[in-house]
């Protein structure tokens, strides 16, 4: 599986284009906005966009979902249903943060822990990782040892838990009990900032290391 990271919105959120090399079929994970930038990658690589994946319902991750799904006629998978209130509240979030007008949406498929999603011939595991938001999910591709973790974990930091229904203890448990056991060699794409690995964060991250 190949990928390209496209930082979008004033929050520089890492939208990610993922594709199966065998089929050139692709998904966009967390298209928060700036859709022309994302679609330039799709066109440059000669990809067929087949779905949208969403880690959680915050506007910088999901603000462009409704427009992209409508433009391409493609389904939306994720997050977990416990983030419905965040998605329903995106129009208000857009006013609060000064974003362009954003539409709410209903995913074609709410995801649960243990589900799988496909991109072309590739299969990603779904891991429910509450804490930053109650319905946050992580996508993990075992073959390439790659995880898309949204705002659960960052290089040297962790996701905020001071939002409605955030839970610090749940976040720490998600990282230590659901992500780190996948293996030190797993590289991850966070919602913001540079990539890292679970091994690096387990050793050096001051919030969850040691």
Language-model regions: role of each:
Residues 3-7, 28-29, 52-55, 125-128, ...:
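Short, flexible loop segments at the rims of nucleotide/cofactor-binding pockets, characterized by
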